[in-house]
Curated annotation (Swiss-Prot):
The lineage of its organism: Bacteria, Pseudomonadati, Pseudomonadota, Alphaproteobacteria, Hyphomicrobiales. It is found in: Cytoplasm. This is Translation initiation factor IF-3. Residues 1-20 are annotated as: Disordered. Its main location: cytoplasm.
Length: 178
């Protein structure tokens, strides 16, 4: 049973620093990157305070833990910048759809292919959908032929992720950039 009004300990993110390091001895790396060997934690804290910096635990899983004398604020700032840069570089792959009919004109086909090329340049996947109307369902081979032509025209910059298949009155194929 929990005690009323007792809050859990706050969850700390980032490495332990200064007084949070409660191990008797640590492997110390100085502010300029030199290895100072195994040092008592009190002495390491004193050295960090004299330098006006913080004692930060770098590798807690080794015996003794590796600590470094550095500016904790600068370390946190650098980590935030690195995380923001990684988030910025992440590209969410979207699936763009190109709709056609089996009896598409050559110029219309070229315009659709140009749009498809633009989508691949942006790193997006393309879903090619062929819609059949009325009696066009009797000539599914024309639709398959058109999708094979799309596949052949995009081989240098795209690969087929999902082969052409018929679902109801639509034939679909998914292409992904190489």
């Amino acid at each position: 049973m929990r005690r009323p009004f007792k809050t859990d300990a706050p969850v700390k993110d980032g490495p332990r620093s200064n007084r949070e390091i409660r191990i008797p001895k640590v492997q110390l790396i100085g502010a300029d990157g030199e290895n100072m060997g195994v040092v008592p934690t009190d002495q390491a804290l004193r050295m960090a305070e004299e330098a006006g910096l913080d004692l930060v635990e770098i590798s807690p899983n080794v015996e003794p833990p590796v600590c470094k004398i550095l500016d904790l604020g600068k370390l946190k700032y650098a980590n935030q910048k690195k995380a923001a840069e990684a988030r910025k570089k992440q590209k969410i792959v979207e699936v763009k759809e190109i709709k056609m009919r089996p009896n598409i004109d050559t110029h219309d086909y070229e315009v659709k292919m140009k749009a498809m090329g633009r989508f691949f340049d942006e790193g997006d996947k393309v879903k090619v959908t062929l819609k059949f109307r009325g009696r066009e369902m009797a000539h599914q081979e024309l639709g398959m032929k058109l999708l094979q032509q799309v596949k052949a025209d995009t081989t240098e910059f795209a690969k087929v992720e999902a082969e052409p298949k018929l679902e109801g009155r639509q034939m679909m194929m998914v292409l992904a950039p190489k």
